[in-house]
Amino acid sequence: LTAPEAEKYMQPKNPCVVTGLPVRGELINADREFSRAELGVDERPVILSMGGSLGARVINNAVTQLIEERYERKDCYFLHATGKAGVGMFDVIEKEKNINLAENKHIMLREYINDMHRRMAAADLVICRAGASSLSELQALGKASILVPSPNVSENHQFHNAMALVNKGAA
């Protein structure tokens, strides 16, 4: 099993073994300082947010609001992956919210992040869905997180995934 909480849903003939979920070696070996330098950030906190490759409207909208409320302070960096469905967020930020992304280097929007292991290493806070792989990566890196479980998954499993971390004080 990946988490001890899953055992109550099993009907094993033999005892269950909690092994966790393996994570990529490149994630474990990603260097925080190198990753931050590569990203071009100083000591200010980095908030990494994402809703998956397709995007998540609720996360994109919340991050848009967060950026609008905080961008003038320039006290942190925002690195957000909009996903395929969220590419319109660029126009919302620039045209509707009147925030010039070229002038605000502390706001970094991408459709997709190809080198997530380095971006996670650079981050101080991660806002994301509560899929099993994402949670394993957050735990492996010891990252502070705000989890937004998807309501569109079978048996509400992302909620249960998130609660396993919340109950341990890890999210």
Each model region followed by its residue ranges:
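Active-site-proximal region of nucleotide-activated glycan assembly enzymes
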Residues: 1-32
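Short, glycine/polar-rich helix-capping loops at beta-to-alpha or helix-loop-helix junctions
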Residues: 3-12, 134, 155-162
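Short, acidic/turn-prone active-site loops that include or flank metal/cofactor-
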Residues: 4-6, 22-24, 112, 132, ...
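Short loop/helix-cap segments at secondary-structure boundaries that form the rim of catalytic
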Residues: 6-16, 90-91, 119, 138
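Short, structured coil segments at secondary-structure junctions
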Residues: 11-14, 74, 103, 141-142, ...
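Donor-nucleotide binding loops and adjacent catalytic segments primarily
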Residues: 32-34, 40-125, 159-163, 167
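A donor-sugar binding/catalytic signature common to diverse glycosyltransferases
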Residues: 116-157
